[in-house]
């Protein structure tokens, strides 16, 4: 799934320890240089050492995702509210594992592509933002929108990435919904945990 590769690669470029207070577009822009430099300087280790790769995904990417909000969205309100609190926690942990594995597969695919940010327009809500960009590839352009939500401490976390109209979370939600309808939530959690 080529688009998923780009979604992941693009997000990784913007994941950084400075992803905190301030305008979300500023932090996304500042992160590009830091992460692309890290990837360039550590390409061999990222390619050859799975433990190093996993630790970098845990350090650079996962803390920047709003796993709880993502979990609610991919399951849908009905499924989320039907689960007990321990089941929700278990699902979040399994979904987090899926994110780690997914980003591990794509971290090394960055090849110096350029990204241009469109002018940021603040929305009606101060706690939600959408940052638009264009990812310049050899094959053409990809339009990328980042959906972010401000957490309780005032930092921003990404909860969805949309590339050329395709939402990462909508894709997962569609897959998960089909699985839940066929086999139930417990089966989905078990499958996420076993991969």
Which residues fall in each region the model found?
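Sec/Tat signal peptide C-region and signal peptidase I cleavage site
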Residues: 16-20
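Low-complexity, intrinsically disordered terminal/linker segments enriched in charged
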Residues: 160-195
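Short leucine-rich amphipathic alpha-helices used at interfaces
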Residues: 46-47, 51-53, 57-59, 64-66, ...
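Surface-exposed, charged secondary-structure patches
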Residues: 101-142, 195
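Short beta-strand edge/turn micro-motifs at domain boundaries
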Residues: 143-170
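Sec-dependent N-terminal signal peptides
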Residues: 4-15
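Early exported N-terminus immediately downstream of N-terminal targeting peptides
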Residues: 23-103
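A mature extracytoplasmic/lumenal domain signature
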Residues: 95, 121, 135-137, 148-150, ...
């Amino acid at each position: 799934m080529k688009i998923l590769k780009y979604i992941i690669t693009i997000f990784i470029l913007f994941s950084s320890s400075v992803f905190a207070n301030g305008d979300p577009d500023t932090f996304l822009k500042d992160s590009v240089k830091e992460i692309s430099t890290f990837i360039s300087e550590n390409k061999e280790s990222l390619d050859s050492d799975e433990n190093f790769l996993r630790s970098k995904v845990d350090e650079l990417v996962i803390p920047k995702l709003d796993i709880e909000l993502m979990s609610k969205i991919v399951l849908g309100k009905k499924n989320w509210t039907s689960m007990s609190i321990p089941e929700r926690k278990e699902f979040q942990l399994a979904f987090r594992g899926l994110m780690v594995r997914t980003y591990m597969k794509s971290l090394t695919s960055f090849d110096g592509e350029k990204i241009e940010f469109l002018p940021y327009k603040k929305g009606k809500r101060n706690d939600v933002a959408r940052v638009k960009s264009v990812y310049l590839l050899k094959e053409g352009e990809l339009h990328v929108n980042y959906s972010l939500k401000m957490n309780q401490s005032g930092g921003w976390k990404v909860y969805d990435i949309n590339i050329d109209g395709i939402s990462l979370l909508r894709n997962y939600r569609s897959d998960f919904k089909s699985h839940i309808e066929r086999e139930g939530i417990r089966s989905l959690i078990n499958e996420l945990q076993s991969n």
